[in-house]
Amino acid sequence: MRSCRSCNVRVLVAIVCGLLTGIVLGLGIWRMVIRINRGIFVPVPSIPVQFCRNGGTWQNGRCICTEEWKGLRCTIANFCENSTDGEFTFGSIPVGRYGPSLQTCEPGTLNAGSPKATRLCNVSEFGNIELQNVTKGSCNINLQTLEIQINNQTASAENISREAQVLTADASKLTAQNITSATTVVGQIFGKANNESQAKKTAIATVSQILDASEDVFQKAAEMDNSKSFSNLIKQMENYSYSQGDQTVVEPNIAIQSVTRDDNSGPSVLFSVQKGSSNSLVSGRILINKTANGLNPDGQTELQILLNTGENRKSCGFMVYQNHKLFQSKTFTATSDFSQKIISSKINESEQQRQNKVSVEMVFNPTYDKRELRLHSYACVYWNFLINDWDTQGCQKTGNTTEFLRCNCSHTTNFAVLMSFKKDYKYPKSLDILSNIGCALSIAGLALTILFQILTRKIRKTSVTWVLVSLCSSMLIFNLLFVFGIENSNKNLKTSDSDINVKPENNKIPESDTIETPNPSCTAIAALLHYFLLVTFTWNGLSATQLYFLLIRTMKPLPRHFIIFISLVGWGVPAIIVGVTIGSIYALSGNKRYWELDYRQEEICWLAVPKDNDYARSPLLWSFIIPVTIILITNITIFVIITVKVLWKNNQNLTSTKKVSSLKKVFSTLSIAVVFGVTWILAYAMLISNDDIRIVFSYIFCLFNTTQGLQIFILYTVRTKVFQSEASKILKSLSSSFDRTKPMPSITPLKLRVRMYNMLRSLPSLNERFRLLEPSGMTEETSLS
C-alpha cells in the first residue's frame, strides 16, 4: 500500500481525465452513428418528396402549383413560351397575365427602366394557349401624366386604360405613389367611361396587376391617399359588377360576375369560388346558380355567398378579390403571408332602397398551410365606407364545422372573414444525454477552474489569471443559462381546434392576423445568452491579444491600467451591442405588439433567424455573427503566429535546461486553441447544404464546444504543479484514512528483517516556464500550459 501511495499522482490524474474524455468522445461517436443510421433507414412518407413537380408544394392534401403549371402533380404547362413580335421580345407568360417586354424605356425618359410593351397570354375558345397582340406603351407618359389626362379628358379612356396597364405590368417596381396614381386613374375610368367597355376590362387587368405589389407598398400608399382613391375605386367596381348583364371577367387577382335574373329565377343567387391547383383565380373556378335554395359547400369549395333578396330582382353582381390590399385597415394589421380574400355582393341601389329584407349568407373554407398555422379566431365583417375600415354591425357568426366558417349579414357590400392564426411552432426536444453530460462537465470544470485560479493566484505568480477567470466566469454563466433557460416555456401550452372563437356574441375584429403568446422571460433569457456569449468571445479575443503582447511583442510589464482597460472592453462592449440591438428593434417596430419576436425566436430563447433569407435585417447577423467572425479571424491569426514562432520553434527569448517534447508542444497548442475559441470555426461548417455532412459537423461542433469548460479545466488546472501537488496531498490523506480504517489480521505477523526498495521512477515534469532575459522589475511568469 505504501508503494501505491508513492505512485506519481499525475499518472492517476491523467487516467481519470482520459477516462472522462473517452466517455464523452464515445457518447458523441455513438450518437453520431445512431443519427446516421436513422438517416439511412427513413420511413417512406405517405406522399413522396417529389410528388409535386415544377416548384409545386404539398399542402392540405393537394399540390399547390405555381402559375406556370397546373394539374394533379403540376405537370401540365400553363404558360406561353418565349416569343418575339417585331422589335419586342417576351419571356414566358403565365396564362391570364400580361407579360412585360424585355425592352425597357431608355434612361432620361419619364418611364426609364419600365417595359415598352406587354402581351397577354390567354386560352382560346377551344382550350388552346395562345398569345394576344402586343400592347405598346409610351416612354414619355407616366401614371401622374395619366391622372392629368383623365381629369382634363385630353385622351380617350381606352388609351389611358391601355397605358395604365402597361405601366403597372411589373408590380415589383411599383412605388406607393404609383399605386395611388394608378388607383385614381382606374377609378375615374370606371366612373367616366360609360360607353367604353373595353377600357373597363383593361382597367380590371390593371387592378389585378396592382394587387401583386407588396403589402408594405400598399400600406405606404394608404397613408398618403388623401383623396381616398382606394375607396372610390372599390365603389366604382361595385357598381360595375351588377351592370354587365351575365358577363364574367376573371383576372388572376380579381373576378367579377354580373347576373341578370328573370321571372324563372328564385329569390336567391349563389356565387361560388372553387379551389384550384394554384392560388390564382381562373374562369373555370367561378360558378353561379340563379335558383339556389341555400349554401351547398363541398370539399372543393373555397368560398360561397348566397344573396337573398326576398323577391326576384333584375340584376345583381358579385366580386372576389384575391387579397385585402385595397382594404387597408387601421384596426386589423396583416403581418403574415396569408391572403385574406374579400367577397362582394351588390344589387342596384334604387332597388335596394325599396328592399326591406336583404341578407347575405357566406361560407369560407380558408386555404392556409395547416402545418405552420393554426386558426385562433375569426370575425365576420364588412367594409364600412363611412369610417373607411372594417365593421361588424349587421354581421354575425353562424357557427362553423371542421372545414367551413359561416357568416350572416343583413346588408350587401364587401365582406370578409378576418382570421387570426397562431403559428404552429415546432419546439425542439429537451437537451439529450450527450448535451447534458457535456454541459455538466463544463460547468463543474469551469467552477473548479475559477476557484483554483483565485485561490492560487499568489502561489503561481501568473499574469493571465484575471483574463482566464473572466473568460471562465462568462462561459459558466452562459452554460447555466443555456441548460436551464434555452427552452421556451410556451412549448408546454397546448392548443386545439376547440379553442377557435365561434360564439356569435364574440364577433370581435382581431388586432392582427397573427397571434403570439408573449413571454418576457424568454426574451430576457435570449438577451442574457446573447450578452454572455458575446462576452465569452470578447474575452477569447482579449486573451489572444494579451498573449500576443507577452510572447510576440515581449511587452513586459504590460501597459499601465491594462487590466482595467480590458475589463471595460470585455464586459462593456458586449453590453453596448446588445443594448443597441434591442433598442433599435424596439424603435423600428413602431406600435408592433410582438416586437420581441423580431429579436428572438419562438422555438428557443435565442436570436431570431433571418426570414426569407433577409440577412440584412437579422439581429443574428449584425449583432452576433459579424462580431464573432471578426474575433475568430483575429484569434486564428494570432494562434498561427504563436504556434509557429513560439511553440514549435526555438525562441531566442526562452531558455530551458531540457529539450521540449512533442507531447508538451501538443498540449501547449491545445491550451491556446481552447482559450482562443478556435473550435467555434466548426459552426461555419454547419452551413453546408449537404444534410449528412452538416449532421456530422453538428455533432463534432457540439462535442467540442459543450465540453470547452472541461477542456479548460484539464489544460489549465489539472496539468499545473500546484493542482497536482494539492491533489496528491488529498489522495495521500484519503489513502491514510483508508489504511487506518482497514482491520488488521488477527494472526501476529512474523518479525522478519525486510528492506524494501521503491523501483517506480517519477515521470519527468512536462510543465515549462520561461523568463525574459532582460532585467525587469516584474517577477510574474507566463505559462502556456
From Swiss-Prot:
Glycosylation sites: N82, N122, N133, N152, N159, N178, N195, N239, N289, N348, N400, N408
Any Gene Ontology biological process: cell surface receptor signaling pathway
Gene3D superfamilies associated with the record: 2.60.220.50, Rhodopsin 7-helix transmembrane proteins
Membrane topology category: Multi-pass membrane protein
Molecular function via GO: G protein-coupled receptor activity
Key words of the record: Disulfide bond, G-protein coupled receptor, Glycoprotein, Membrane, Receptor, Signal, Transducer, Transmembrane, Transmembrane helix
GO cellular component: membrane
PROSITE patterns: G_PROTEIN_RECEP_F2_4, GAIN_B
Tissues where this protein is expressed: Selectively expressed in the intestinal tissues.
SMART domains, sorted: GPS
Recorded phenotype for the gene knockout or disruption: Deficient mice exhibit less body weight gain and an increase in intestinal contraction frequency.
Cytoplasmic-facing ranges: 457-465, 545-561, 645-668, 716-785
Span of the signal peptide: 1-26
Main location class: membrane
Region feature GPS, mapped onto this chain: 380-425
Subcellular location: Membrane
Entry keyword Transmembrane helix: yes
TM segment ranges: 436-456, 466-486, 524-544, 562-582, 624-644, 669-689, 695-715
Pfam families: 7tm_2, GPR128_GAIN_subdom_B, GPR128_GAIN_subdomA, GPR128_N, GPS
Highest taxon of the lineage: Eukaryota
Residue spans, topological domain Extracellular: 27-435, 487-523, 583-623, 690-694
Disulfide bonds: C380-C407, C395-C409
Function: Orphan receptor.
Family that this chain belongs to: Belongs to the G-protein coupled receptor 2 family. Adhesion G-protein coupled receptor (ADGR) subfamily.
Protein name: Adhesion G-protein coupled receptor G7
Source organism of the structure: Mus musculus
